[in-house]
Amino acid sequence: EFGTRADEEVRRMYEAWKSKHGRGGTSNDDCDMAPAMMSRRRRTAGCAGGVPRHLRYIDAHTRGDAGLHTFRLGLTPFADLTLEEYRGRFLGFRARGRAAARYGSGYSVRGGDLPDAIDWRQLGAVTEVKDQQQCGGCWAFSAVAAIEGVNAIATGNLVSLSEQEIIDCDAQDSGCDGGQMENAFRFVIGNGGIDTEADYPFIGTDGTCDASKEKNEKVATIDGLVEVASNNETALQEAVAIQPVSVAIDASGRAFQHYSSGIFNGPCGTSLDHGVTAVGYGSETAKDYWIVKNSWRPSWGEAGYIRMRRNVPRPTGKCGIAMDASYPVKDTYHPGTGTATARAAAMDVIKMVLA
């Protein structure tokens, strides 16, 4: 019968999942600690005799593929969480009205000037994948990744910067209870810079703002921010061709929770609840995709990244990726206010990419 697995197979898969994702305890206790992973049958048949609820969903996706899906699901770090627990612990973006940015709608390179593909990881503008743990600070991780990117492009120096400083010190947002990337950019601008990850490390929860570090260590600075035109994937592509960009998505679905690899084209809405960073784009077998950096550690997705379908019929983009995008500005990389000089500077970067 579809959806059933032998007790020993379930046990082996569960033990492998525990080992990969750092879970501990005895087998029986672990079964009780992972109710979401097991069906109600475990109450009478025991953990090894139960059918993993998430595994049944994953199996259904795999067997029903038949060429319909371009992505795979697996037992991710969230396989022991119900959908409600997953949403509550890891999705912390809070959508708000968009205020005017210093550089308005920004500058861009148009049409045929855009490279067919770009990957800022390969160009030295993306730090390692981080882990927000059970803190809803995705918005801070998204903003910091974008700042790390533009700072690396402008200075030639890739430095891991501090999410914890923003979580602790940005009074406009709510730390691990949620926030918005644009507010994080504004905090860094007003603060005169941001500290390094090494000096102000992430602790996985809200902390007290360390004023000594906040005022004395301003390793990276930004001078403004740009809000990308909403509901326009071409505008987002133009922005990502210049630098890593903070984006918000709807990550509330089971398919996203269990994403393992491939180009994500699964079901999702546009109720934006998660901040991530678009660090590139490309195409595979005539399917366009965004390269998106997440903050759920390297064991989720494709080494911590997800490729999301690009150029979909809806103007919002897949999972709303084109609805609320923004990026930080450094005057040394973005001279002027969207003039021909700024576009020329952007073209220099693109020429380097295409060389």
Named regions from a protein language model:
Residues E1-A355:
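Catalytic-core signature of thiol
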